[in-house]
Amino acid sequence: MPRQGNETSCLFGPVNSRRLGRSLGIDLVKFKTCTLNCVFCECGRTTQLSVERQVFVPTEKVLKELNVFLNGGDTQPPEVLTFSGGGEPTLAANLGEIIAALKTNYPQYKLCLLTNSTLLSDSQVRAEIKPVDIIIPSLNTVSPVVFQKINRPAAGITPEKILSGLLDLRREYTGQLLLEIFIVPEINDTPQELALLREAAALLKPDGVQLNSLDRAGSEDWVQPVSAENMQKIK
């Protein structure tokens, strides 16, 4: 389930994920603080549109909550610890510190990061996330006009910058990279847009590509899911 914004814990789940197995979510960002205001976001509209990295949840609180949860004797412990939630995880200035601590204290768990890719052009961000086992970045378009329609970014973010950051990450990162593409009918599913996305994916050479469509209500009512027939055609 998406985050609602009224949670007091930075942990959520675990949930059984098709992609990851049993996953415990770690949310390091104040609810709906993001670099984008995507029309399809199941957490709702972004209330704090920003590219400024800061500490939202103290490292000590995160590690304490994890210690309590992971040593609580859960009969179905998680397989993966996943950085995600109600905002963009790479906005957390202590992300790298937390990743390093988890790798040291809980090496038995895989780490996963879900990111909208907007801060991957920052070499510091890329260095911080390199120890993560699985990174799932998103790229929904490489067209500036469509990018504004779908993702509604903070100032200074462009699809060219995102793709450049993704390519830098691909060169530097040795873990599993799974590209996520969210399809919005009649916006980024035209033959021209899909051709551009295929070209970008061919350049990136991810370990896998995941096509997603609306599953729950997005932030804008006009966004509709892709039909199973059309999704199959896109694949």
What are these regions (language model features)?
Residues M1-R22, T33, K64, N71-D74, ...:
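Auxiliary Fe-S-binding modules of radical SAM enzymes
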Residues R18-E60:
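Canonical Radical SAM [4Fe-4S] cluster-binding loop centered on the CxxxCxxC motif
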Residues G21-S23, C38, P78, I134, ...:
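Structural motif
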Residues F31, Q48, E88-P89, E186-I187:
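Short strand->helix junction
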Residues C41-T46, P77-L81, V142-V146, L177-L178:
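Short, basic/glycine-rich phosphate-binding loops at helix/coil junctions
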Residues R45-T82, A93-E97:
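Conserved alpha-helical substructure of the radical SAM core
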Residues T82-E88, N116:
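Glycine-rich beta-strand-to-loop/alpha-helix junction loops that act as flexible
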Residues L91-V226:
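Conserved AdoMet/S-adenosylmethionine-binding subsite of the radical SAM
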